[in-house]
Structure formats: C-alpha cells, structure tokens
Regions:
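N-terminal Sec-pathway targeting helices
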Residues: 2-17
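Hydrophobic alpha-helical membrane-insertion segments, chiefly the h-region
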Residues: 18-29
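Active-site-proximal substrate-binding groove within the catalytic cores of carbohydrate-active enzymes
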Residues: 27, 59-60, 66-78, 96, ...
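Ser/Thr/Pro/Gly-rich low-complexity linker/stalk segments immediately outside membranes or between
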Residues: 29-49
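Short solvent-exposed loop/turn micro-motifs enriched in small/polar/acidic residues
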Residues: 48-50, 129, 260-262, 812-813
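Aromatic-lined carbohydrate-binding/catalytic grooves of carbohydrate-active enzymes
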Residues: 467-555, 559-624, 650-654, 660
Length: 857
C-alpha cells in the first residue's frame, strides 16, 4: 500500500521531468547548441578570356546565337524567321530607365540574398557581365553553359603589386621609352636602407616583408581601375605573362580578397527539337554562409516587348489571364503569384489575399507570334511575375522567380525585440528548368492548345479518359463539430448535417431527376466531421449511421450509377493530440526556426491570426502520407471505390526541420505516390483546384478557380487551362450555390466548358450558427434541389457530346458575350450583360447562354 502511495506521489514529478526533458531535447538543444560547421564550397571567380566569335547552336527548327562579350543571345524560329531576344537591344537608350534599371534590362539573371541588415538584390550584368567574371563552355551534348561569378569583385589585372628592382628593370628594358616613363610614374621604389624615412614603413613591411632584404617597386595604393587597365597594357608590351605575375605575387604577404557577397550561378542553354530550354542546376550555386541566397530569377527580360509592340502577356492566374502591353495601369501593383499557393511551413503573420497558381506556364504574344514558358524543374519553389512598360523602363516583361533557401524569423527573447533569421541548411537537390515553346500565332487559344499537346505527351497522361457527358459534382456535408449545451454544460459535440440515409435520398432525387455523370463527394464522414481528427485510426461517425449505414450508401450509389467519393484531409491535424495519435514534437512539420508549424484561423477584419481560437498543426509529410494510406485502406475495406483528397493535389507544404528536411519538391513526389497508391487500391480519385502534377491521377477535378484573385493590372480572364484540359480531364468550377453571384458562376462554367458543382446538406443551415462552418451558409438541399435538377438537366442536354471534344476557339466580344467553339464547329454563346444580345445572327437572352450546333445540327 505504501509503495502504491509512493508511486502516485512520484508520478507528477516524473511527468514534469519528462516535459523538461522534451523541452531541452526539442527546443534547448536545437537553439543553444552550436551547430556543426557546414562545408559550404566557397564561390570561385574566373574571367572570360575568349574572343568575340558568336557561340552558335542549331537544329532543324531553331538557331541560337550568343554574344560572348555580354552573354546576351537570340533564338530564331527558322520557319518564320522570328527572333526572340534575351534582352532588349536598345536598353541603353531607354528614356525612362535610370542607371540601375538599365542594368536590369541588360541582365540575364538576378538574385536576392540576405545581409545583416535585411536583403539585397544583384543582377548579373552589373556584378558579373560588365566585369567579365564569367566563363562559357560549349558542352559535349552541344549545350552552352555560362558560369557566372556575381558580386562586388575586384578585378585582377596582370600587373605586379610588388616586383624586385632587378625584374622591374629587366621588363622595363623591353618597353618603348615613352612607356617606360608612364610605367615608372605608377610605382614607388622602396629600398632597405631608406625605409626609415618612409611614413608608412610599418605598413609596407607588413605587406611586403621582402623589402627588408632587397629593393622593391610597389604599385601606388591610389591607382584607379582605369589606370590599372592601361598599366596592364604596358606590362603586356614587355612580354609579361600570368606566370610572371604568379612569381611576383609571392612578394605580397597579405592580399585583398573579395570578402563581400559573391555567388556562383550557372545557366545552361540547349535546343530540344522545336523547344528552347534553360537550366540552372542548384548544385552549381555557391554562396558564402553570411550571405544566403534566397531568390533567383532566370531570363527576366526574355522576349520583352517595347512600347511600339502590340500584344499581351499571359499569366496563369485562375484559368488564365492576359495583361495587355502598355495598358497604363501604373497605379496598380505589378503581378506576382506563388506556384501551388502558400507553403504553410513558412510563417505569415497576416493574410490579406491568397495567391496561388495551379499550372506552371506563362507566355507572351506579340506581332503575330508567341511563346509559352513551362516551368518544368523546381516548379514548386517558383512564382510568376510580370509588369508593364512605364513603371521602371519602357518594356513589358514577365518571368519566373524561384525561392532557393527558405527562412523565417526567430524571436530570441520576449525581453528584447531582436529577431534572428534562420535559413535552410542546404540547397535542394534540384534544377530549375524552363522550356520555351514557340507558336506561329498570337492567339491565346493556340498557346493553350500547345500546352495541352505538351500535357498529352507526358507518359503519365497517356491512359487518361474523359466522360461523354458533362460531369456534375455534389458535395454532401456529413457532420460538423459544434458546442452544444447539454444539461446546462457546453459540450464539444458532433452534429450530423447529412446522414448516410439522407444522402441516399439526395442521390435518388438527382439520378431519378435525370442527372447523369453524378459524382458525390461525401465530407465529414469520420473522426468528428469536416474538421476531422487525424486518420491514425479511421472511425466512421455513428451519428451518420455508422459503418453499416456507410456500406448501404456505397451499395445504393452503385445501383444508381453514381460515383461516390469520401473526402478527407491529411496534411493538417485538427483537434488532435496524443490520445488521437498526434504528438506535436514528432509529428508536426517545422519552420526553419525549428518551431512547430502551429496555425490559427485568420481574422477577416484585421487579416491577422485569431489567436483566441483553437490552432491546428501542419503535419510532416511522412505523417500525412501514412494517414492518407490509412484512409485509403479503410475505404477499400468498406467497399468504397472513390477517395476525394481535400488537400493532396491542391495544397503543398514542406517541412524545414533540419534533422529531417523534406523540400516542397519532395513533398510533391510523396503526394504523387499517395495518389498512385489510391489508384492501385482500385479507388477513383477527386482532387480540388487541379495542380498540374496531380492531373494524371485524378478522375475528376473539382473547385477549379475560373477567376483568379482579381489583380487590377489584369485586363482579361481567359480559359487557358481549361482549353488545354478539355477533352482530356473532367473538371468542374466552384460550388454554384455558395458563390456570391450564382448566375455569374454558372455562366462561367458554361463559357469554360466546366462541369457543374454544388454543395448540399440535409439539415437547415441554422445548425451552422455558433460554428466555424459558416461557409456552408447556402447549402440547404431542400432550398436548391428543384432549381439544381432543372439547371443540370438543361446544361447536360445543351452540352451533350462536347465534353470529349477539344476547344478550338474562344473570344470575348465587345457586347459582353463570350463565344467558345468546339472541334465539331459547335459554338456556345454566353451573355454576361443585362440585355439581350445578338451575335453572329444568334440571339442570346440576358444573363444566359445559347448553344449553336456545328455540322449543320
């Protein structure tokens, strides 16, 4: 008995000791233990020593010609003779650009690096090309590699800083008399016997100790760079060589080094059939530990269009967007958006707007021709930026920009405002790759079809199929979490909003009402509902009907030829702790600061974190992958044939824990493995939004963003992505009944050839009061079912046979009518205006659409 009492008394102390041990292991040791010095290769500096002979690559479709004195180049399409320049030819005469902006116009690369004071930008024109600190190699495979040393580098001239009097006189004798006098005027003779008379005696002895033994000529310290170049010519006249320079430099005890920020970056150019490819291997990047490189931008001015050019820039915003040349929107921000959205493993203290791109393509059309650039390698580190003429220079330009080393700020102490930046330990094992495709057309439809052809040629896409009928997606909200008062006490409870039996009734209503190609996404079916707990153990919610009710629903959906998918989130841990199998110390992803990624909802008023609400965690990728496997296995065991990933294929985040780093590219590969696993288990797959790397494994893409974020600099939204995918993949827009303007959302689906999407729940939406699920405010099924069935039936009947066809044309008429043309000649007219319109002899009612069949039908 006494022993048991002793154990119970000891238990709290054991818990405290365990907590302290965890604090030391996971916080104290990482923060205060000195890191093992990293072996970062030092940047190397080499100088261009070639001649001015152009460097040429050529094949049947393209020719590439580089000026070795600037590394500027042009790519010529042989069929059309159209030339694309790496940099504007007349940058120096730009009337708007100041000196720094002219340097940027002449750069083929720019980078951002950290300093003690913050960050700084460098371009490779001012800090490499102008100084000749680069080398050019024509490699065995025919590609051209340019190795840049970028930084404030003091140029090395082949002139001796110090030389013995004997050697000085010998070389001087080989010069003309006029040259001898000029040379001698730049040197001072120091002799051992006369050193005491020199004011800088100690400095001279420290730098040139041999002066104590013999007379030396020493270069004057105030010699200018221009004068050094002239002196180099004098020495060259005497036959002075690099070997001589090496001998004389041995007299120098201490030499100046390039102690500032210096970087090595290599760019590789190659021709691949009719495509031009540029690469930046990450293993070519060198930097000093004091100056981590954070961003890199290849070819920022490729194809830049002047104020005289006509055309537009294409950016992958939403389904696609155009920015007209010289549109005069200088009061608006320039364009920038992140590829695949935010990386949740990087900190943000406020969220004003969410930028995301689903497909890595940008392009430009001008003067009858165009190109698209596909960001093939290191894509997830990238973003797209674009700007118009008149802001910094007279050119319209766009390019890709890539994150290299990620960082976050660490608050050292609550007693000080000092913040320390902590960076990734090592460079990713990746290679930036950009593929430029040239199109003999300036129509965005042709640019989109070129991208579509590229997608179809990818090996993973060869087995994809598309439905004959336009798809319909219906999300049914199963259960939510809510604080419910029971016996006078607030209890965190699970509330059923659509039971499995009610879902059967809804599926029956829709299919019996004539809806075809119905895809049902059932969310909130396990682990406490929509904001589910982690899937370490998958438990079907009993309030919905339990496993028996779920099996009945699966069987019923099969009988009705409806595709049934069960939704789940695996990347986040909501309301999960040790009892649910989630341990933050070991299972949460980490920032570069080594802190766990803890996320709070953002306030819609202040845009800052709502830290009074419950947080949730970003799971480390391996933990998320394991939970996704548990979900897939559970569904297979219950006889389900469809899995709907709420995050995989849509969100993409890294884990910057230095002890187990998972880059964003590695996380992407893990997501692909998960989707392959689902396929191998016989599951169909739904993804949201449609990140390009997930396309081959998705049977349906829902919730595609057709609008984008609404950047003011954009002039026009276009269905670029949808044109590329139509006839290849089934896709839908965002839920019509949850949109701010339901008619507008429906009409956009018609214009973009997208399936229709709805979100329903059986219970009245009053149940959402006092919850965090107000986004379902318009999801009450009974309020929508008649209108939804009528809308779907009309749409599927009007669009019958078009889902498997490609889109061959698209245009927006001045009257506010969009016209989409399919391969059989069928035209779909969508009237966004408040008045009836007549276009091409076709009458389109206000805020409605009309389908005119092709081939005389």
């Amino acid at each position: 008995m006494k022993k048991k009492k002793f154990i119970w008394r000891l238990l709290p102390w054991l818990i405290v000791l365990a907590a302290l041990a965890a604090l030391v292991v996971f916080v104290g040791i990482p923060l205060f233990t000195p890191e093992v010095p990293r072996d970062i290769p030092a940047p190397q500096v080499a100088y261009f020593e070639g001649d001015e002979t152009p460097i040429i690559m050529e094949n049947d479709a393209l020719s590439f010609e580089m000026d070795p004195t600037t590394t500027h180049f042009k790519v010529t399409e042989k069929a059309s003779g159209r030339e694309w320049l790496s940099n504007p030819a007349d940058a120096d005469s730009d009337p708007i650009a100041v000196a720094a902006n002219k340097e940027m116009l002449k750069a083929t690369l720019s980078l951002t690096h950290a300093t003690q004071a913050g960050v700084a930008d460098m371009n490779n024109y001012k800090y490499s090309i102008e100084n000749g600190t680069y080398t050019i190699e024509q490699q065995e495979d025919g590609s051209v590699r340019v190795n840049y040393a970028i930084g404030k580098i003091e140029k090395i001239y082949m002139i001796p800083t110090a030389i013995t009097k004997e050697r000085f006189d010998t070389f001087k004798a080989e010069m003309k008399k006029s040259t001898q006098k000029k040379l001698t005027s730049n040197y001072t003779l120091y002799e051992p016997a006369k050193l005491d008379s020199k004011k800088n005696k100690d400095e001279i002895i420290a730098m040139y100790p041999e002066v104590l033994n013999q007379a030396l000529y020493i270069l004057k310290s105030d010699t200018s760079e221009n004068n050094k170049a002239k002196i180099e010519g004098y020495w060259a006249e005497s036959g002075y060589t690099a070997e001589d320079y090496a001998i004389d430099q041995q007299l120098v005890a201490g030499s100046k080094d390039n102690s500032g920020a210096v970087f090595n970056v290599s760019m590789v150019y190659r021709l691949d059939g009719s495509d031009f490819v540029v690469e930046i291997p990450y293993d070519s990047i060198r930097y000093k530990e004091a100056y981590p490189i954070t961003f890199i931008t290849p070819l920022p001015m490729f194809g830049a269009a002047s104020v005289e050019d006509e055309g537009y820039m294409f950016v992958p915003e939403g389904g696609g967007a155009l920015i007209n040349f010289n549109n005069g929107k200088l009061n608006q921000n320039s364009y920038y958006a992140n590829m695949y959205g935010w990386d949740y493993a990087t900190r943000r203290n406020e969220m004003i707007s969410e930028t995301r791109l689903n497909f890595p393509v940008f392009g430009m059309a001008k003067n009858g021709g165009s190109f698209i650039c596909i960001m093939e390698g290191a894509t997830s580190y990238g973003g797209v930026m674009a700007d118009i003429s008149g802001r910094y220079n007279s050119y319209n330009w766009l390019c890709g920009k890539y994150n290299v080393l990620h960082s976050d700020q660490y608050n050292v102490s609550s007693k000080t405002a000092q913040l320390v930046f902590m960076y990734e330990q090592d460079l990713p094992d990746d290679c930036i790759t950009q593929r430029y495709k040239f199109i003999d057309s300036d129509r965005y439809v042709d640019m989109a079809n070129a991208y579509g052809e590229y997608l179809r040629q990818q090996p993973e896409m060869t087995a994809t199929t598309v439905s004959e009928q336009m798809p319909v997606s219906v999300e049914m909200v199963g259960a939510i979490d809510k604080i419910v008062v029971k016996m006078g006490l607030p209890i965190d409870s699970v509330v059923a909003t659509t039971t499995f039996e009610q879902a059967q009734q809804m599926i029956g209503d829709l299919t019996e009402g004539g809806v075809e190609n119905l895809n049902v996404r059932f969310s909130g079916w396990a682990n406490r509902g929509v904001n589910q707990r982690v899937f370490t153990d998958v438990k079907v919610i009993k309030q919905l009907g339990g496993e028996a009710g779920m099996k009945n629903l699966i069987s019923f959906a099969k009988d009705k030829n409806a595709n049934l998918y069960f939704d789940g989130v695996n990347c986040f841990a909501y309301d999960s702790g040790i009892l649910q199998g989630f341990v933050g110390f070991s299972d949460a992803a980490r920032y570069t600061t080594r802190e766990q990624v803890k996320i709070y909802p953002y306030d819609i008023i202040t845009y800052k974190e709502s830290d009074w609400l419950d947080p949730y965690y970003l799971a480390k990728p391996s933990y998320a992958k394991e939970n996704a496997s548990n979900m897939i296995n559970k569904l297979s065991g219950l006889g389900a044939e469809g899995v709907a990933f709420r995050d995989i294929g849509f969100l993409l985040s890294a884990d910057y824990n230095p002890k187990a780093l998972v880059t964003r590219e590695e996380a992407k590969a893990m997501n692909v493995e998960t989707m392959k696993e689902a396929q191998a288990a016989g599951q169909k797959v739904i993804i949201r939004s449609g990140n390009d790397y997930a396309l081959p494994y998705a049977d349906l893409i829902t919730d595609m963003d057709l609008n984008g974020a609404g950047y003011a600099i954009v002039d026009k939204n276009v269905p670029f992505y949808q044109i590329a995918l139509h006839g290849v993949k089934d896709y839908t827009g965002e839920p019509i009944n949850l949109a701010n303007d339901t008619v507008e959302q429906f009409l956009q689906c018609v214009e973009y050839g997208a399936g229709l999407n709805y979100t329903f729940m059986a219970m009245d939406t009053k149940v959402l009061q006092d919850t965090l699920h107000s986004g379902f405010y318009a999801a009450h099924y009974d309020s929508w079912k008649e209108d939804a069935v009528a809308t779907i039936n009309r749409y599927q009947e009007d669009m019958a046979g078009l889902n498997q066809q490609s889109i061959v044309d698209h245009e927006m008429r001045d009257s506010g009518v969009a016209v989409t043309t399919y391969e059989d000649g069928t035209k779909v007219y969508v009237n966004y205006s408040e008045r009836m319109r007549r276009v091409d002899g076709v009458t389109i009612p206000a805020r409605d659409y009309t389908v005119e069949r092709g081939n005389g039908k």
